[in-house]
Amino acid sequence: MKIQLPEHVKQIIHRLQQEGYDAYAVGGCVRDTLLGRSPQDWDITTSAKPQVVKSLFSHTIDTGIAHGTVTVMLDHTGYEVTTYRIDGEYEDARHPKTVTFTGNLVEDLKRRDFTINAMAYNDTAGLVDAFDGIGDLKRHVIRCVGIPHDRFGEDALRMLRAVRFAAQLGFSIEEKTRQAVADLADNLQKVSAERIQTEMVKLLTSAHPEEMRTVYELGLSRVFLPEFDRMMETPQITKHHCYSVGEHTIHAMQEVQQDRILRLTMLLHDVAKPVCVTTDEKGQNHFKGHPAEGAEMARVILRRLKFDNETIKRVCLLVRYHDDRPAVTPRNVRRAISRIGVENMEALFAVKRADTLAQSMYERQKKLSYIDAYEEIYREILKEHQCVQKKDLAINGRDLIAQGMKTGKEMGEVLQALYEQVLDEPQLNNKETLLALVLQLQQTKQGRSEEHTSELQSPLNLVCR
């Protein structure tokens, strides 16, 4: 079997072979190439020890030299080169206490997680596949190398990785491997939130986000996302729904594109339903207040999983407004854009459609038509360049200073009042009209009697008369 290696990978392997060492491309790059995919990076394994690797290449980085890994830099691209090794006993479900370098490739491949990741290749020896990884690729199976309980005991994150690979590749998890995950799921507590987040995002943004169901079934989500377990266990007895909250969530994730923000939003859009559910006298469920409560819960969850502030902000905003249904008028849509932000509206429409498509058929067309009408007005507003952000207001602080106004609280209040007025009446958004309103405000303020001073302190009252 012939694999086309990149030139830099060939160079590294050839240089090591010239010095009498074995070297192979290994792991995910071999797997992806055999699947007809383009590997994101190429890793190399070798019988040469780290110091030898460092001596053979002019630019190297000690990325994990204690565990035998050196990054070789060629034309500003890094290639991890790792010495064959045998791992000692694991004490923290992630790192071995000791590492022993070996000259035996198969011994090195034994320590790897799954058979599909335990294949090596070079142009001289061809494909080295000691654990039938190629067979598992053909069978579309995720299977541990050796004894699953041992592999997961070495690094508990491998359990979540098993489901992630199943999601990315559309594979199933082999039964003994699956059972070992269920047996050892609680060990995921030993893994950092950052590492869990990385695997979760890869799963969510894969072609099969429905594998979150497997995460739940195997007991993994109860460790890092117990809120999802409650969602899976909360029915929705209402004509608008045909699934539990969790199943609705899974179907909704499938209805949006493979985008990080959208998939996270759909995962969490109904996260508060289990805590907001009520049942009326007819036995029907209601979830009043779940968007606002859900936004707060989403914030807590995303912080717990160490997401960045921008992701938290966007996801929580979309969760907060996913079920917002203002009357579809230009005024209401302008105000919605102002609250939500132009940059978030396309995502909001995607979220609303996905939410609807994951519900029952009850009034589905009516709901979709509402979203279409909402979006149509939104696009018309953008086309006409109507003011929906304060920065689009036809005047600014410099213009007010030129009118004799001092900087400070009053200026901010006046600009806000003008902005509110323009949201209602977009035709007012030209410099002359707005300056005339400001002038009117100033004249009115000067001419009013003392007993009305308190009323006149509101710029909103003055501008909007």
Give the role of each language-model region:
Residues M1-S449, S454:
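Catalytic cores of the polymerase beta-like nucleotidyltransferase superfamily
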Residues E450-R465:
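Single conserved hydrophobic/aromatic residue that forms the stacking wall/gate
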